[in-house]
Design a protein with these regions (language model features):
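Repetitive helical segments and hydrophobic/amphipathic motifs
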Residues: 11-12
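Sec/Tat signal peptide C-region and signal peptidase I cleavage site
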Residues: 16-20
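Bacterial N-terminal signal peptides that target proteins for export
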Residues: 1-8
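Sequence context surrounding c-type heme c attachment/ligation sites in exported
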Residues: 24, 28-60, 67, 72-154
């Protein structure tokens, strides 16, 4: 797991850092798309959590949500090109630390990728116990990134 995280971090650092330096062609559209994607991921995470809290978790409900998280996780770093932070004049909770601390942001993104892939693997295997075990890592990766790189609601 540690080796996988280091590999994902290295690739994400190269791709994410290069992309983050490119200016956004339309900051408002980029922020809006980013926020819509995060809302979908939050809904997927809540749906999985709700299923696990129910008396009988439904894999047909969990699997597509876990797949969405895994699929979107690899794109997160690309959702923050330079010029889409508070300086863009667009309402966003993205903190300047995303761009001033690219290594930290890249590591947070890579941690999410690894956790989301583990959750998706557990869901694909139909292993409820493994899904239960994997979900907290996804939740921690989200919270860790939010604590550092997301500001309060306006």
């Amino acid at each position: 797991m540690k080796k996988l995280l280091m590999s994902v971090t290295a690739v994400a650092a190269i791709c994410g850092a290069a992309y983050a330096q490119r200016p956004a062609p339309n900051a408002a559209a980029t922020v809006q798309a980013r926020q819509a994607s995060y809302k979908q991921m939050a809904g997927a995470l809540k749906g999985i959590s709700d299923q696990l809290r129910s008396g009988s978790p439904d894999l047909a409900q969990i699997r597509p949500r876990a797949a969405l998280l895994a699929d979107r996780s690899v794109h997160v770093l690309r959702w923050f090109p330079r010029g889409t932070g508070p300086e863009a004049g667009v309402r966003t909770r993205a903190k300047p630390d995303i761009w001033s601390n690219p290594q930290g942001f890249t590591h947070a993104g890579a941690t999410f990728v690894v956790a989301a892939r583990e959750l998706n693997g557990a869901a694909a295997a139909g292993d409820i116990a493994r899904i239960r075990a994997a979900l907290p890592a996804v939740q921690r990766s989200c919270a860790g990134c939010h604590d550092t790189f997301r500001g309060p609601e306006h």
